[in-house]
Design a protein with these regions (language model features):
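Residue-level detector of Asp-centered blade-edge/turn motifs that repeat once per structural unit
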Residues: 49-50, 118-119, 167-169, 209-211
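Hydrophobic beta-strand positions that form the internal "hydrophobic ladder"
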Residues: 54, 120-124, 153, 171-174, ...
């Protein structure tokens, strides 16, 4: 159901005098939520490291269309010019498909959880290929902010990806459910092959990295 209230994303300056009035970057008239309802997961929102751009997950639909569609996308808001673009649809400054005309959009499944590279040149995120299939494989995708090129890093890896972290600008780490366990994996985009780093009869729920050290939550 829809109660007529929606979660929006605001950006505002915080100075000595407190928080100044913020800008609703979703749009005051937008009748949808950021982060996505019903979980409102803050992991769907990510500042770049320079603090100049904000990536977020959004599904700009209303009513029944919002309820039945899995076509969420990653949007990037630029603080300098106030413009937003959708990185999951063909990028040429305007949409290349018309939903009203029955055209099928590119990447029609869930696209969520953006993670910026340390140099802010790339965004890693999770993507599902098929529309309407919430149990579809969760693929690890990489978007190049300069060329707008998109790369499926786990195309030949038959497991879901989750909890993505960057190691420098050239390697990504993540958790994958493998044969009733959860293991830590890594991949260098230029090498193109996933390496399963941990092994054993356990579930790794979360992990963090510092240099050559990894701390993991294991059960």
């Amino acid at each position: 159901w829809d109660e007529g209230e929606h979660m929006h994303l605001f950006v505002g300056d915080f100075g000595p005098e407190g928080l100044r009035p913020g800008t609703d970057i979703v749009g005051a008239d937008a009748a949808w939520d950021v982060p996505l309802a019903p979980y409102f997961d803050m992991a769907e929102i990510a500042w770049n490291n320079a603090g100049t751009q904000l990536a977020y997950t959004c599904k700009p639909l209303t009513g029944t269309a919002y309820a039945v569609s899995t076509d969420s996308d990653i949007f990037v808001y630029d603080l300098a010019d106030g413009k937003t673009h959708n990185i999951c649809k063909p990028f040429d400054g305007k949409a290349r498909y018309n939903a009203a005309a029955g055209h099928k959009p590119a990447m029609p499944g869930y696209d969520k959880y953006p993670v910026w590279s340390p140099d802010d040149r790339k965004i890693a995120f999770l993507s599902q290929r098929r529309a309407g299939n919430e149990s579809d494989k969760s693929r690890l995708f990489l978007y190049d902010c300069r060329t707008h090129a998109m790369q499926d890093l786990t195309e030949d890896f038959d497991y879901n990806a989750m909890n993505v972290l960057w190691e420098g600008n050239d390697r990504l780490w993540f958790i994958a459910p493998i044969e009733a366990t959860h293991q830590i994996c890594r991949i260098a985009p230029d090498e193109g092959e996933v390496e399963v780093v941990t092994k054993g009869d356990h579930d790794i729920a979360a992990f963090t990295m510092a240099g050559e050290q990894i701390v993991a939550e294991l059960s």
